[in-house]
Amino acid sequence: IRDQITNYFCYISGTKIEISPYNVNIRAFGSFSHAAHRILMSATTQDDSFFVKGLDFSPEAVKNPLRNMSPKWSGEKMLIIPSLVDDSCDHDLIVTEFCRIQTSKFGMIALVPSTKNCKQYQNLGAIITTAESIFEELDNLKKGEFSKIVVINNRYDGIDLPDESCRVLILDSLPYFDSLADRYEEQACPNSELINKRIAQKIEQGIGRGVRGEKDYCAILVIGSELVRFMRSIATNKFF
């Protein structure tokens, strides 16, 4: 940073300062930039331009990716929007009814975007995970220790909930961006297609948490007016 300070942005909020590059000098990392083979795998990539601008890949490599011409069945997801099934099945009803369940034969997970969104679940006795407890709670589910619904705060990737550990996944409310840089872009360009692609990518990542294999399956409930509107809008449903 010291040697290339002009290539960085600085964002300041009420709680933190964030410094991030707008032009990464990827060639400074020889083990990556000079590698004979570089393979990137993602199921949810929405913006291929990052590979060229951010990772210094050639446009030809991005235009001609390796393709699996015989993909396997990747599990089954049943996507349900309760508010479209019946007007009475609103956000509060879904949260309340699932929090009433004290024992279950399978894991139930709610993904929420912030601590604020956890409050209703917490008041109704759900298990709220923290940075310290999340992996212990997920291990309990994988061991078959099912009880109340488990709430995960702003973790749309990096966690696996296979088989019985998650048969019901509640995707609650529109995801937030983590970084100040992304939040600034969202506020400055609220209708940007690139921003909408990033939001859609987070949603897709969340949807994929409960199905991790070709024989896996999960019911996914989508609640929260902003999230439902985003997924159904003519301008944004093309990303799914």
List where the protein language model places each region.
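Short active-site oxyanion
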Residues: A35-I39, S104-I109, F146-K148
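Short, basic/hydrophobic alpha-helical segments
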Residues: D92-T103, N140
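Short, low-complexity, polybasic intrinsically disordered segments
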Residues: F230-F240
